[in-house]
Every structure is written in C-alpha cells, then in structure tokens.
Amino acid sequence: MTDMLIVIDMQRDFVSGCLGSKEAQGIVPAVAARMQRAHEEGTPIVLTLDTHEEDYMETREGRFLPVAHCIRGSEGWTLEPEIGKACCRGMISFEKPTFGSTALMHHVAALAMEKGCISGRGMTIELCGVCTDICVVSNALLIKAALPEADLIVDSALCAGVTPEKHKAALETMRSCQIQVL
C-alpha cells in the first residue's frame, strides 16, 4: 500500500494556461483517477501549489522564466478543474515559492517519524504531476534526501515535462537516484 500520494502543481497555468501543454492536459484524467483511487484506499493525498506573488518578474525565477504564472489568487494559480473535483476532505496542500518544497519534505519526514520509520524504511510514497523536469524531480530528490530508505515511485504516465525530451531526461535522473519510475 502507498503511504502517501503527492500531486505536484496540477494548476491551471501549468496545464491549460500560460505554461500548459498538450502533454500536461493529457495526464489530467489519469491523475484525477489516481487521486480518486487513493482516496478510496485511504491513502493520504498531499498537493503542492506553485505560488508566486505580484513581484514574480523581479525574482530570480522571473528573470530566468519571464512568464508570470501561478500568481497567488489568480485563476492560473487554482487547480485544474478536474483535479479540483478529485480533491476531498483531509487533503493537505503546501504552497511553495520555488521548485521544491522544504515544508513538504519536513512533513513527509515527520510522518515517517510518527510511523517509526525515521529513514523511511517500509514506506512507499508516490509522486505525480508537472513539470517532471522541474518540480516533480526537485520534490522527489528532497524526499529521497530526507528518507533514503523509502520506496519512492513516480508513474511516468501521470507526469508531464516542459517538453517530452525533458520529461524523459528527468525520469532518467530519478532512476539514477534510485527512484522507481513506472
């Protein structure tokens, strides 16, 4: 059984908005179905939300990626509608101003401590979402650093990268770091 499903940044701007892609749009039904299955199985679901402020263009990320996106409170910051419909009570979300969420990493580590699995041994954590080559890989590696013995799983069919090539490259990076890629 999976101890946690982590859904990364399935927000409008990354799926159907200013940074969206047909690949990201294509995974929405499968991600929503996976969330529903996790809920039915009693698996905790955690969401991340890329969250920027109005001064985004003045930030380091804004200088390197000059496309204002996921501005707090904007329509693009909200979850893609089908993903929003798949949400249920008890879900936790973490807003993050950058690619990886240290708050998420600490949350997962605390859960491991509660279970008596300080290194993550015996835990299975699944990640999915967008973008494979930016936020998915960043969060997977943060969790791997915090819980080196946990089984981390990334289902490639439930992820989309900036491009198909970058998606594949990120999957290979995660495989190299002993993350199971389906």
What are these regions (language model features)?
Residues 1-93, 114-119, 153, 162-176, ...:
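Active-site acidic carboxylates
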Residues 49, 129, 156-157:
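Short secondary-structure boundary segments
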Residues 95-140, 160-182:
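Conserved N-terminal glycine/acidic-rich loop preference
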